């Protein structure tokens, strides 16, 4: 009977877990719809900005007064990695994929003689990497789901990046994030953001155009905005990927809990039947002994 009671308690516990994971799946699905809309609506603007930069940048890059955000400062010695993860777990391999890739890139860069610093957008990667790479941490931004606006990103993250770059704290900057493909598919992505990559083929797209003011002046205004677009787009992609991963993980958890309940229920029924059979045998045996 003690075994039956333990099984009954365990069945109840698994059922409760299933209800919790089912609720978490529904919440993640609702957040995913919103995050997907935001990521997809930001893509056309990002592509249009990229095309504009490719029209302006090639000609300006070869001039002496080219903006540093475009051409850099010469030799790259210090590299800043901007790492996007979630603030919370229970989202499958979403966080671990980025963390593993970041750890590998740090080792690779340090082996090549670069000085590395880390900027975290989301707490999970910071919580893991601070144990081994705490001395590399530059800044940590958390609770970004509450601040999913272009204006916030531009004011609080991008301005700091540009300021630190101009002060010489780093020479190059790369973003690492999960690009959203679908609820069940995300692609780890590395993107150079500072100096902003120049498409040399883009030089042909500007033929026949005259810019007023000149390219350098336009770029001084457009480069910070383009950087903000890159950082925000990566955040939007990461946010959608997080909710997609969490919804998928919770869906798997619900299914697994359901399977476990069925197995435990079968085991409970068999144990109960065995206990009843044993009691009947004892009763019959006792009655027979009394007759004797």
UniProtKB/Swiss-Prot annotation:
One of its GO terms (molecular function) is ATP binding. It is a peripheral membrane protein. Its main location: membrane. Keywords: ATP synthesis, Cell inner membrane, Cell membrane, CF(1), Hydrogen ion transport, Ion transport, Membrane, Transport. It comes from the Bacteria. It is found in: Cell inner membrane. GO terms for biological process: proton motive force-driven plasma membrane ATP synthesis. The keyword Transport applies. One of its GO terms (cellular component) is plasma membrane. InterPro entries: ATP_synth_F1_ATPase_gsu, ATP_synth_F1_gsu, ATP_synth_F1_gsu_CS. Produces ATP from ADP in the presence of a proton gradient across the membrane. The gamma chain is believed to be important in regulating ATPase activity and the flow of protons through the CF(0) complex. Belongs to the ATPase gamma chain family. F-type ATPases have 2 components, CF(1) - the catalytic core - and CF(0) - the membrane proton channel. CF(1) has five subunits: alpha(3), beta(3), gamma(1), delta(1), epsilon(1). CF(0) has three main subunits: a, b and c. This is ATP synthase gamma chain. It comes from Magnetococcus marinus (strain ATCC BAA-1437 / JCM 17883 / MC-1). The lineage of its organism: Bacteria, Pseudomonadati, Pseudomonadota, Alphaproteobacteria, Magnetococcales.
